[in-house]
């Protein structure tokens, strides 16, 4: 069996993550796990934050099981936090998988243009995003280092209070709502 790859798409909304994830899905025969598609299917116009984390966690569990079975997987969430990326890098390593991290960035003007175009062309696949939300999210985004992207940088230790990245992952992405 060949070594599976976990592809991580990293970036803010409308930067090209899902477009790239769809290409990776086909080119690498990968299971693509795109949170927004699941949120829309399950919640429609609603976008409850409590459900978002649970859906991400369930999709991660599915993706990690697929890796254990030897399949390539694309996690298409944004992964704005370094801890999120470290937890997934460690989970992949624990399962003998490679990680390919792809970071996507566009100018704020291009992002706004893409968001508006998406809202016009395929409103059923997205939610309206205000400029205020974009600015808040950009401030929260922890841009990956070049070492994170290439894999040459060691995976950080889990944050204080967490013995392992698996324990942190279960806390970050809870198994159920509530």
Language-model features: locations:
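P-loop (Walker A) phosphate-binding loop of NTP-binding proteins
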Residues: 12
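A glycine- and Lys/Arg-enriched "phosphate-lid" helix/loop adjacent to the NTP-binding pocket
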Residues: 93-144
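Phosphate-binding P-loop
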Residues: 1-3, 66
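Glycine-rich phosphate-binding loop used to anchor ATP phosphates in small-molecule kinases
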Residues: 51-99, 103-105
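Hydrophobic anchor at the beta1->P-loop junction of P-loop NTPases
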Residues: 9
């Amino acid at each position: 069996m060949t070594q599976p790859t976990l592809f991580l798409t990293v970036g803010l909304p409308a930067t090209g993550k899902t477009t790239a994830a769809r290409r990776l899905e086909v080119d690498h025969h990968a299971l693509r796990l795109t949170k927004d598609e699941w949120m829309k299917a399950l919640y429609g116009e609603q976008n409850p934050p409590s459900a978002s984390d649970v859906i991400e966690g369930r999709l991660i569990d599915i993706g990690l099981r697929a890796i254990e079975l030897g399949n390539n997987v694309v996690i298409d969430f944004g992964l704005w936090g370094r801890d999120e990326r470290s937890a997934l890098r460690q989970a992949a390593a624990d399962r003998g998988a490679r990680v390919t991290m792809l970071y996507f960035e566009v100018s704020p003007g291009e992002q706004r243009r893409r968001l508006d175009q998406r809202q016009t062309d395929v409103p059923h696949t997205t939610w309206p995003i205000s400029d205020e939300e974009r600015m808040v999210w950009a401030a929260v985004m922890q841009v990956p280092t070049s070492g994170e992207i290439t894999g040459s940088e060691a995976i950080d230790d889990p944050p204080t209070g967490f013995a392992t990245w698996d324990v942190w992952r279960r806390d970050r992405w809870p198994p159920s709502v509530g």
